[in-house]
Each structure stands twice: as C-alpha cells, then as structure tokens.
Amino acid sequence: MQNRLSLFFLCMFFLITSLNAQEGMWIPSLLSGQNEAEMQEMGMEMTAEDIYAVNEGSLKDAIVHFGGFCTGEVISDQGLLLTNHHCGYRQIQSHSSLENNLLEEGFWAESHEDEIPNPGLFARFIREIQDVTPLILNGVKPSMTEKERQDKIRANIENVKSQFELGPFESMDIKAYYKGNQFYALRSVRYDDVRLVGAPPSSIGKFGADTDNWVWPRHTGDFALFRIYAGPDNEPAAYSEENIPFTPNHSLPISLDGVDEGDFTLIFGFPGSTDEYLPAIAIEQLVEEINPARIEVRDRALAVMDEAMRNDPEVKIQYASKFASIANYWKKWKGENLGLTRTNAVESKRAEELAFRKKLRNNEDWLATYGGTLLKLEDNYRRSLQLRKSDAVYGEIVNRNVEGLRMAGYIARLISFYEEGGDEAFRSFANRLVPFMENMYENYNAGVDQQLAVTLLEAYPDLMPKEFVPRVISENKNDLDNFIGEYYKLSKIPSKAVLDILKNDEPEQAVEKLKKDPLVLLVSDFDLMYRQDILRPLADIETEHDSLMRHYMAAQLLVADEDARIFPDANSTLRVGYGKVNGYEPKDGVKYLHQTYLDGVMEKYVPGDYEFDVPERLISLYEAKDYGPYAENGKMPV
C-alpha cells in the first residue's frame, strides 16, 4: 500500500501522526519545479499536473476553503463535502436545541430534502494561482518610506486586479508571501449554498475534547459531511429549493484500504498562519510573556463557561461552539510553549542566527545591505514587548471573550460614525451591525457573560502595566462583582433592548440614549486608553517591524544553501505538504504508533464523562466486533 492518498490526511491539513519530515507548505502551482521529483522518489505515482492544473480537472478542484476558516474535500460527483467535525461545529450547534440536540445525538440526512441549509457558510475553490511579484513591486524603490511602499503596493494591487478577466462568480485576491517579498494572485469561485448532511454525536466527533486536542495518541472521529449546491447551470447561487447538488471538476475517490507505515501521503488544504522565520528573541518573548498572558485569560474564561455549561443544558448548547473556539487556541498555545521549550527552539534559532551572521560577513555586498538588520529587529522586539503583550491581553478581554463588552465596543464605534458622518454614516453601519448582533444574541446568556466580565476584568490589572488600567477598574478592583453587576443591570445591551433602539429610533435619538449606556461608557474608557497608549505607539513600531522582517526574510532567502527548504509561511492560501506515514518517539521510552484503534477509545472511556463518554451503540459494536468491511486485522481504525 505504498502510493495511495490518505483521505483522512487530506481532511486535516496538519498530521496527527508524524510525517517522515519533508517539512513545508508548498505553493501548488510551483510543485513541478520545486518538489515533484522528490515526491515521486518517495512513492507518489501522480504528477504535479495531477495535483494542480488550470485547464483540466486536478486534485485542487476537489479542495475547498470551508467557510474561510477550514479545509474541506469534495468526495463525490454530487458535491458531497468532507471536513472536520470541529470545522462544522458552529453549524451543528446552530441547528441544535434541547428538543433536537444534534450536538449530542448526531445527525444523518436520509435524503437531499433532509439536508440542512447554513446561512453564511460557503465553499471556495481556487481556479488559478499566478506569480504577480513584478507587477506588484513595479515602481517600488528602496528609497521609499514604509508608508510610501505600502501605498504603492496597494495601488498596484488594485491596478492588477482590475486587469484580470474574471468569469461569472469569480473573484481575485492578491496575497503577500515571504513577508512581502513575493506576491501571488489567486483566482477563485465561491459557492454559498452549503448544507449539513451528517455528523456523528460529539461523543465521537469531539471525543477527548480539550484534553486530547492537539495531542497524540488521538481517538477522535473528527469528521462531518456537507453538500455544495448550485443553480441549475451548476454555477454558484444563493440558497434556493430549486438548487441542485453541485457537479465538481474533480472529486476524491474513497479508499477503504487505509494506510501503512512508510506510505507516501499528501496533505492539501488552507493552513491559517505560521511564523517559521522569526528571530530567537521573538520566540523567547512568545514563550515567556505573550502566550502565558493569553493562556491565563482563557483559563479563566473557560472555567466560567465550563461551570455554566455543566449546570445548564441550554447553556451547554448555546456556548458549545464558543467554548470550543476559545479552547482550540488555548490548547495550541500551551502545546506550543511545551514544544518550543522541549526542543530548545530559542537556542536552535540563535545557532541559526550565528550561521546567518557568518555568511553575511563572508560577502561584502550582503553585509553592506543586511548587516544591521537582525540587530535592529531584535531592538524592535525589546522596545515593543510590553505594548504587544498589552495589546494581546486587551484583545482577549475587551474585544473577544466578553460579548457584552464586545457589543458595547461596536456601539461606541457606531456613535463615532454618527459624530463624524451624521445620519447617513449611522444608518450605513447600523444596517450591518443589527444582523450581526442578532446573530450574537441567538447564543447569548447575560448571566454567563456578566460572570465572564467580572472574572476577566479581575485579572486585567494583574496582566497589564499600571498605566494601561482605566481608573474605573483600578478604583473598583476589590468590588468588581457588584460594580459590573450594576453595569449589566442598567445597560441596554445584556437585555437586548439595544436592538429596539437601533431598529426604531432616529439616529440622533439612538445616539443620545446609547452614549449614556454604562457598558458603552466603560468600553469607551478602555478604548480611549487603548488607542492613545497602546495602539498608536504600537502602530509605529509595527510599521518598522514589518520593514525589518521583510528585509530579514529577503536576507534569509539570499544566503540560504541550495538545498535549503525555504517555504513561505502559511497565510490561509492553498498549500501542499507531503511525506511518509510514521509513528514517532516524543521522549525517552515512549513510542507512538502511526495509527490508533477503537480499542484505545474504550480504554479512555469514562461513563458519563464530559470528554470521554462513548455512545451505547458504539460500545455494542465494539463488544460484538461488528466492524463490517472497515476492520483491519480484526481491529477498527479510528
């Protein structure tokens, strides 16, 4: 079984098992020149054109950007779409209620008519990827300031986009790669009618929940099925009962053969973001300062939500998707810190930097151009640490994890729009804000949100420099429970009364009412401090950082050895990774196999547990060893 594609690996852009380290996230249109020979030597029987082609069907035509935040794969000629359970979790949750709890019970449509629409969900296909670097950097000069450079690049991007001939329903996006040293245009088409077809219960699709997230061995049945629908002409169309299942240019065939150690495997998808080429000081600050602060905030937020969800089944449904979203990066940051510490990543980076500096010193031209870049970049990180850490904490508490504060921030922005642009500006923003807030309120519990506000604002003074703490918080630090309770009681945001004002009042009346709202006043105090003391100075430092990082990246590309594997950081664009399936040894005396089985699920099973419960039906199948054609030597692969 040497040369099969593993659909399981395609479904998850990053491997849970270990690849035989051919690291990289490569641009599909460049595989023939960069990677094809190596891939074929490793066992791939396809060609680069089988993976990426413009004028005929190829693997890329079966890979979609699912909702703009995940990867999905078309696995039938009727638009059936496979993705992860956690990627479809928000949609599954949105269709759940106490009476019809799809999260707990799962869902399987018995016909096309039973498939459930998901407003706002889309599937985007990449049609073509083109290198447009010379066009985007046309007229960009070394003597330009960073602002002049960015202004010129933005103008060039708009000019280039206007010159592309796009088909119906197509769009063009131009993305920076290698920290702004290269640019690629991505032509795509978006389908907006994507319906839920099937999902296992969370005790399978989310088995192990946060304890097992981002770690191995994993026993989660992390999958869900959707279907793309199109108009009668197979072109994108808004939801309609008249739409029909989409016929793709290519779909992935399903194999029941599984994978063996040593099999070649290909990963195709849309990874979010990475920072492969940071200097050592950035990694050090991330591990020691920024990640711990973000983890501390989310520790507190998750504890509040977890208690509320365990005590109230309705809250459990309301907050399931939010909890999973917050927990995902919380666990990732914890694992990131653990991995970077265990692998001595900072010391390894410093060794690379010594070698980098040595190469520069051996070439006068390189030294003249890039000799001071790394020193300046390190100085930039030292000067910006407290600002970047404070920005992260502020974002976690005020802009993300407390919805009452978040909505108050939007109202404060609406008031600013009115003060600057009058009735027209108010109505323009309000028309977008109302449906957004209505969507937030669908899964909002004022009591839970109030407790989140109290808990996180209690942590705020401990995580921020004193000068970044608004006086209203420092003065009420020892009585935040009552202080915040009174604000939530008097505010029109937790009660949803704000929607009536936005919908029914004239702009002037609405502004007069809303500018006196306690939560709006509180957030306005935060926002004034944030913009003056954090955002403005940080913006200047970040502009300098972006320039230095671009030069540092250019220098790394310039001095790299011929066989160096320098791939661009992930930026939510289509990429390819590849390697061989293997287990790995994370530490002394521990070896992980390449595959897990249902036996491991039952070993972890804890009856009634929040994370490790198992459905009765699955227990019965396990006890009867009733695995149908899916067994592997009498065992059921997960």
Which residues does each predicted region cover?
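Bacterial N-terminal signal peptides
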Residues: 8-17
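Terminal presequence/propeptide segments associated with secretion/organelle targeting
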Residues: 18-638
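Bacterial N-terminal signal peptides that target proteins for export
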Residues: 1-8
